[in-house]
Amino acid sequence: MSTHNVFFAAKLGDTHRQRFRQHFLRLNASDLHLRFGSSLNGSAVINYVRGIDCEQDEIYAVTDDAKCILGVAHIVVMEQEAELGLSVLAPARGLGVGNTLFDRAVMRLRNRCVSEVLVRCLHQNAAMMHLAHKHGMEIQHDGTDREARLALPAATSGSHMLEWLQDRQASYIGNLQDGSRLGQSLLSAFPVFGMRPAGKKLVKAGSSR
């Protein structure tokens, strides 16, 4: 009997900085260049993680059964506008991790009454451009840079309820994953609302490839 991976984006905070750092340090030089729009060494990555404002910013992550972070969405909110950066580890690309993170970020921003989300990336970041086109973002060209914007609808009681449900489910599924085999059997047996089975201040340019 085949099983399906179920991806969910869980909110992380200040106590997870070590896991953020481990995630970014697993990206190679090319991945870091696409993610941040410039070349970063290990020290710069550590400084970036140290500088994340977990009180004001929003951080969401998709993890595997071993609690390894497969992908991270870092959202910097600036009043009515927010900037989004995505990164996904190479083995998890093409499975929907980036899309899951994008959807969760948009839902959170909508419910925070943010009117527009912005993504900046290099023109060669084909995966991020694909994600931007897929979600109907308006893309502007500026030399080698691309700037994609998406206007967000106003929050409703329904959008707040959906976010609450997804947060509860993310927590529940995370607890199930701690049981590994039992958790996977339960996830395979029951559909999970809002979750998607696997299918084939320095936030620039998330790499979701």
Predicted regions and their residues:
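Terminal substrate-recognition subdomain of acyl/acetyltransferases
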Residues: 1-4, 87, 120-121, 127-209
